[in-house]
Amino acid sequence: MSKFIKIINLKLFVVLFFLVIPNFNNAKEILIYADSISYDENSNIIARGNAKIFQENRIILSELIIFNKEEEEIILPTKFTFKDSDENYFEGENGYFAKNLEFAEFDNPKIKLNDGSRLIGKKIKRIGKIDIISKGVYSPCKSRIKIGNFICPTWQLEGEKILHDNENLFLYQKHSKMRVLNTPVFYIPYIVTPSPLRKERKSGFLTPSLALNFFDTKTSQSTSFPYYFNIAIDKELLFTPMINYGGGVDESQRFVFDYNQVISGGSFKTDLTFDSNFENEDNNKWLTDASLITKYNKNLNQNFRIQVDSALQTSKNYIQKTKPNDDLSYKNSLSTNLNLEGFNLRKVDDYFKVSLNFYQTNQENEDNKIIPIVLPNIKYFLGYKNHDGFVNSSTIEFYNIFREKSNLVHAKKQQKISHKYNFTKELIKFNSKISFDTIIYNQIFNTEDKLIYEDNYKTGAYFRLFPIISISTETPFILNKYLKKFTINPKLSLVGSSGSSNSNRLSNEDSTNNDFTLENIYELNRYSGNDKMDNSKRITYGISAYKDNLKTTFSQTYEFTKNSNFHKEQGNDDNLSDIIGEIEYSRNNILTYNFRYDVYHSYLKKQNINFSTDNNIGKINISYLDQNSKVNNIVTKDIETVNYSLISKSFNKFSKIKFNGLYDLKKEINKEYGIGYSYFDECFGINLDFNRKSYEEDNLKPQDILTLMFSFKNIGSYKSTNLAVSENDKQDISWESYTLDNDEFTNK
């Protein structure tokens, strides 16, 4: 037995000697192992039984390997497995490899890429980093579906020729056909997609999209050809031209530029969209409409940061038409804001900000002439100073605001210089926390053409000294005897001010009518901003009680001032304010109840119930709102609505359903609702969503939106939206392509 082993070792040594010694200058030598190694009459090396060839971190496994020394080829007549240096696995038969393993050709290839994607075909030819597969099929799906007697992946791409570029990481397919559930869904003569092995961005065309638009008996088409530019490691541009044609409509083009850049200490992003119809006859105007959205953020140094946020459009509603899902579509006005912020300039906690603000209306019923321009707004917070427990701070502010036309609220032009001084002292006495707070405003206004009534305008300079002082106390204690570990915290606050009512000669530029809530009831100035002052003398009292998962809070105010502006604007007719309260219970579920109760008229002016849970069914949210028009001077109608939503847990492993809606109990209609289904496995996703929006105007019909989207791993998403009101109204059926993060797909 030992003699047999010695012979085997001798043969192995001879093989290694003849393979390595003649070419020792070549760094990529191969090693051959097998149960049996022999030579044929042509001095070819024949390895049988568990044969292996190693070259650096590449390996070939087979039951029979023949090495042709003269041609320097590795012949593989039977089934074999090859692992390359990138951990990709190849299976095949009846083929050969060059000695350096860079060139190969074999039948029935089966390739498993290192991300789990698969490629199979009839024949493969490997030239360096290029794999050319004849009659190939590509799919990233691991799961299989049985349809009749056929077992197939969820989806796959079939190509007459598939070329996989392992170096530039592109997948080229000729005469490509996609099958979903073994059903052909589309054909394209030539398609280029990023390789599933891609880890870095590359420039190139993305999947084009085709849209069919049906208008009565006419049909028009639009096509887009997105191209991605990988400009640099920190810069990218997506250019998408869209062409509309046919159906008797004007030929037009839309061009979208989406540019992103990472800069030192920040980022820059801009989206440019413009429409053109330069193909029309007798047309001398190539640009019809456009929008430009820009975001720029940069830390200039350790103390300063600059931010630019801009949205511009050439006509009203253009962004609403081109970007209906963007938050900008729902704003009354677009803005261009330039902010320069400074930190830790003189003190560690000071803060400096300069803002330039320009606005543009975004709604048909808005007048651009009353939209303000802020040039500039400057604020400087000097930081806190603490002297023996006395904490004080100061804020200096200046603004210059102007517009074309004034109204009852806003002047044509106004400048303000304001100094705010804040003083606070806290004491712990008698088991209570006692706080003393003082705010003193010194302000100078220069106002031009402020409309008082009808054609009566006022212009002038005004000085205002407005102090507000308060003393407050709270005394928490625990009830151990009756309610074990129940904490009770009563609170009392006395606030006094000059009592001077806000003048209608001043333009209100930065104050808004805040709701009367638990969040601001103890504030000294309950208005946001300081153009309007809370001219109130009042006492505020409340009590909080909490234990573990239960918390309750109740508060009320008594006004000593008859002409308290904030008190009146919040719908309070007498000295006693409404009672406001909140009850919250949170454990596995969260239930909150907020209310505002009018004590004089004995009715709930506002109540809101919120319930949310995350259980075995899914995430459920239900919100009920009942609000009277007297809550403030902005709300003009009574409101009673129910808002609801459900996002289910996954069922059947990959499926989810969702629905949501807003039901108007006053009008007994669903103002909006939607229902959707989604399926996402490890390689394929589908979304089907239906949404309806109703309008208060009788002449406006409900808007129905049905959206179908397919998502394919490593390929992207294709979305179709159908807006349909009736058979005779316009219907848009459009397929759009989207990039998709592969993290959306489940790896269960």
Report the location of each language-model feature.
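A structural signal for short, well-ordered beta-strand segments and their strand-loop junctions
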Residues: 172, 238-240, 269-271, 353, ...
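Short secondary-structure boundary/capping segments
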Residues: 3, 322-328, 505-510, 570
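Classical Sec-dependent N-terminal signal peptides that target proteins to the secretory pathway
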Residues: 2-27, 65
